[in-house]
Amino acid sequence: MYRVVTIEEVWDVAKDVKAFRFNENIEFAPGQFIMAWLPGVGEKPFSLAWEDMIVVKRVGPFTTKLFELKEGDRLWIRGPYGHGFIKRGEKVALVGGGIGIPPLYAFAKKNQGKFRQMTLIYGARSKDELSLLDIENYVDDAVITTDDGSAGRKGFPTEVLAERREEFDQVYACGPEPMLKAVLKVMNYKNVQISAERYMKCGIGVCGSCNLGKYLVCRDGPVFEGEKLVGLL
């Protein structure tokens, strides 16, 4: 069930955010996730940023331990699991907030040049917390926001989306739940796909810990069509 990968590269992405590249490529759809396990520590889900990369924010005991890994150390993984983003539309927006960049990064990289227009709208609390990787290389247009105005436009990505929504025939979103709720509201739950997050244990639809109404995020998501989430988010 698990495969053991070796960490080949670790680098800082933003404040308390690191990227880990390992020695094995995983066939995946942008938006899918893996379960990563450390013996004696536990297991957590992570969206794949690329076929050999995850991006991690330090938020608790597991990620703190993960941050100690160095080149040559081992990590146990299983997956990928779940449903990813569906390519749709001609003029699309990728809307992200905080650490929500990995699945959007994967989508942008895999679909570079396949849309008439692909716009990134991404925000974080401050310049130090921008976790962009090099996603700007794969999109046609990028608007960056920060809550405090320390980089890009002061404000929130959903404000930009509200101003420009008529430009897009499909929106892909990942980020904090309040942002996702705002995206769904701006889009009236139509022509939008969101990557949802819930506490997750098994990753395969058995334990039920990641329920979102009648859905299980690990099995039915983590990517959902907006119309399925009316009354749930």
From Swiss-Prot:
Keywords (A to Z) from UniProt: 2Fe-2S, Electron transport, FAD, Flavoprotein, Iron, Iron-sulfur, Metal-binding, Pyrimidine biosynthesis, Transport
Cofactor: [2Fe-2S] cluster; FAD
Pathway in which the depicted protein is active: Pyrimidine metabolism; UMP biosynthesis via de novo pathway; orotate from (S)-dihydroorotate (NAD(+) route): step 1/1
GO biological process: 'de novo' UMP biosynthetic process
KW Cytoplasm (keyword) present: no
GO-annotated molecular function: 2 iron, 2 sulfur cluster binding; electron transfer activity; flavin adenine dinucleotide binding; metal ion binding; oxidoreductase activity
Record-linked SUPFAM superfamilies: Ferredoxin reductase-like, C-terminal NADP-linked domain, Riboflavin synthase domain-like
Residues that coordinate or bind [2Fe-2S] cluster: 202, 207, 210, 218
Cysteine-cysteine disulfides: none
Transmembrane regions listed in the UniProt entry: none
Cofactor info, note text: Binds 1 [2Fe-2S] cluster per subunit.
NCBIfam families assigned: PRK00054.1-1
Entry's family note: Belongs to the PyrK family.
Subunit structure: Heterotetramer of 2 PyrK and 2 PyrD type B subunits.
Protein function: Responsible for channeling the electrons from the oxidation of dihydroorotate from the FMN redox center in the PyrD type B subunit to the ultimate electron acceptor NAD(+).
Name used for this protein in its record: Probable dihydroorotate dehydrogenase B (NAD(+)), electron transfer subunit
Naturally occurring in which organism (per UniProt): Thermococcus kodakarensis (strain ATCC BAA-918 / JCM 12380 / KOD1) (Pyrococcus kodakaraensis (strain KOD1))
Gene designation per UniProt: pyrK
